[in-house]
C-alpha cells in the first residue's frame, strides 16, 4: 500500500504496489509504476500517473474534491471512478482510461486531443470536455458534453445509447453498419436535449458494401439510404421545443480508392420529434433523365488518404534513389594531383524529408560504400564501387516503410595539374520498400491500412566539373554537376487486413538535377578543411500512379518533384600517411520541398 496525507507527496518510481493507494489531501505520483489489486482512495487528494497503470478503480468520499491525471502515453487508469465525492479526471499526452464514471458525485472528464477514454458514464452528474476520443462501451448519460473536434466512437456492438443533457462545439459521431446491409446502422441512439448555437455533429460510418464512386442509380440510392439511416441515430429532443441550434453532417468514410461521400452541414434535417433524417430524391439512371437529386452528394478528395499515404511511400523510394547520387567529394574526398591507384570505403547516414503536394515522408538511413580504382597513364582514375543503403521511413497517419538500396557504380575521374577535375559516374541499383500505409481515421471501425512492397531498378549517370584555384594556403573550387537518373516502373498489390486490395501501377520516373557549387577552404601538407555551398534544381521528376480495386473504376494520381533547394556542407580531408587519407563532411539543406535534415559522411582511402 501507499498513502499521502495532509498535503504531502509520495512518488512511486519504477516499482509495483499491491493493494490500495490512499491520498488524503495529498498527492501520489507514479512513474514506471503499476498499482494493482485494489481500489485507490482519493479523499481530496491527487493521483498523477506517468508511464504506469493503476487498476482497481478510484473511490472518493462525499466531502472531497479529487484529481486523477494521466499525462503520458504509458499512463493508464483501469477501473471505474466511484464514490460520492467530486472528481476531475484528465487524460493528456497519450494518457488513457479504461473504465466508467460510476459514482454519484460531480465528475468532470477532460479528454485532451491525444487522450483516450474507453468506457461509459453511468453518472448523470458527469461533464465531459472532449478533444480526443471517447470509445463508448455501454449506455451512457452525461450532464454536459463540450467537444472541440473530439470523437465519440459508438462502433462497439455494445456501445448502447447516449443521453446528453447539453451539447456544445463540434464532434465526430461514428457508427458501424451491417456490411451485408449498409442501410442497417448498428448501435444505440444519441439523444441531445439542448445545444449551444452553432453546434455541429459530424456523423460518420464506414464504406463497407457501398460504392461512392458509382454513377449507377441503385448505388447512389444505397448511399443515400445509408446516410438517412445514419441520420436517424441522432435525436435532437430540443428541436421539438423550438430550439434550432444544432446542425449536422453525414459522411460515408473513404475506402482504399473510393472517395468519401458527404452532405453539406446544413442539409441534415430533423423531424418534428427531433429525429435526424436525410431529405433526398431517389436517383434515376441516365436513360431515364430527371432533375438532379437534391441535396447533391459532395464527394471527398479525389485521392483518398490511403492513396496519398501509398504515394508518400513511393515518393520516399524515389527520393532515396535521388539522394544516393552524389559528387566526388562525398565519394572519394579531395583527390590530390597525381594520386595513385587506391581502395576506399565510406559510411554515411542522415535524414531526408518531404512535405508537399499531399505527400509526406521522413527517412532516416545509414549506408556504406566501398570502391577501388586504378590510375591510368593518361592520368584518369577508373574504378568501381558497391553500395548499400538501409532506411527507416515514416509517413502521414502512422505509416512506415523499410527502403533498401543496393548499387553498383563505375566511375572515371581525372585531376589536372592546373586544378581542373572531371568526374563521371554511372550507377545501377536495386531498390525495394516494404511499407504500410494507413488512412486518416483513428476510430477502430474506420481505421484501415494496406501493406505493399515496391520493387524496381534504378539507373543514373552524373558528370561533374570543377577547378581548384589556389590562393596561398587557401583555395576556392567552383563546381558544376548534372545528374540524370531513372527509376523503372513497377506494379504490385497492396492488401488490407479486411481482405480488400488495390493494384498499384507506378510509372517510371526520370530525374534531371543541375548543381552549381563552390568550395572554399584552407589546406596544408596534411590535408584541408572546407565549406561548400551548392544550389540544386530538379528539372524533371514527373510521374503518375494508377490505383485500382476489383470492380471499381481506377484512379490516377500525378505528381511532380520539380524543386529548387540549397545545401551547405562543412568537411575536411586528412592524410594519415602519404598513402592513406581520411575524409568527412556534414551537410544540411535549406529551402525547397525536399530537405536534407542532416547528413554525415566519413571515409578512408588507401593508395597502392
Please describe what each predicted stretch is.
Residues 294-472, 586-587, 592, 597, ...:
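Outer membrane beta-barrel translocator domains of Type V secretion systems
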Residues 409, 502-608:
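Outer membrane beta-barrel transmembrane domains
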Residues 391-402, 430-459, 485-514, 538-550, ...:
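Extracellular/periplasm-exposed beta-strand and loop segments of Gram-negative cell-envelope proteins
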Residues 20, 57, 80, 342-346, ...:
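Residue-level detector of the transmembrane beta-barrel scaffold of outer-membrane proteins
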Residues 40, 46-53, 59-61, 65-78, ...:
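Extracellular beta-strand/loop-rich repeat segments of large surface/secreted proteins
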Residues 169, 175-188, 202-364, 368-370, ...:
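Outer-membrane translocation/initiation segment of Type V secreted surface proteins
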